[in-house]
């Protein structure tokens, strides 16, 4: 018997995998998934001062949708925010860029700016580490 695909369960598994990866990252001080029984969001508190960057209340929020079918593209966003800025790496349809992958950023009351982006990682755990590396570089060079 073949198991039927459930996009909600697949999304939950992807988020749980991302949560576990972020819990192992030395910058993440607390990582929580909501709601616990069927994750739709992960929030990580980040100690970015360990990277030599002074920011207040730094968080990374992760959303993941595995797609309606096993062959569908996964859609995700890893979105960083603190008292000064918010930006993120996203993979979903967006009218401002060609393709699915993009980086978006907003400072203050200004609207978002968008840049196309490709991702090297092929699974949620690897992608979580890739995003944390991108985040480190982004904060270091600001």
Predicted segments — roles?
Residues 48, 61, 84-86, 126:
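Intrinsically disordered regions, especially transient/low-confidence alpha-helical propensity segments
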Residues 1-71:
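Negatively charged, low-complexity tracts enriched in Asp/Glu with abundant Ser/Thr
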Residues 5, 73, 80, 112-114, ...:
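Sequence-level detector for tyrosine residue identity
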Residues 99-142:
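Ampiphathic alpha-helical segments that act as solvent-exposed interaction surfaces
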Residues 67-107:
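Short, internal acidic amphipathic alpha-helical interface segments
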Residues 56-64, 86-94, 117:
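Short amphipathic beta-strand/extended segments with alternating polar/hydrophobic composition
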Residues 9, 82-84, 118:
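Generic alpha-helical secondary structure signal
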């Amino acid at each position: 018997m073949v198991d039927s695909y459930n996009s909600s369960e697949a999304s939950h598994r992807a988020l749980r995998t991302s949560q576990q990866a972020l819990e192992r990252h030395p910058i993440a001080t607390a990582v929580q998934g909501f709601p616990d029984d069927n994750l739709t969001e992960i929030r990580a508190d980040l100690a970015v001062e360990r990277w030599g960057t002074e920011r207040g209340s730094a968080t990374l929020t992760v959303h993941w949708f595995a797609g309606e079918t096993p062959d569908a593209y996964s859609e995700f966003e890893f979105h960083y925010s603190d008292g000064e800025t918010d930006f993120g790496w996203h993979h979903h349809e967006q009218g401002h860029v060609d393709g699915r992958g993009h980086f978006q950023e907003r400072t203050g009351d200004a609207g978002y700016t968008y840049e196309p982006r490709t991702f090297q990682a092929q699974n949620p755990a690897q992608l979580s580490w890739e995003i944390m590396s991108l985040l480190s570089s982004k904060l270091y060079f600001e």
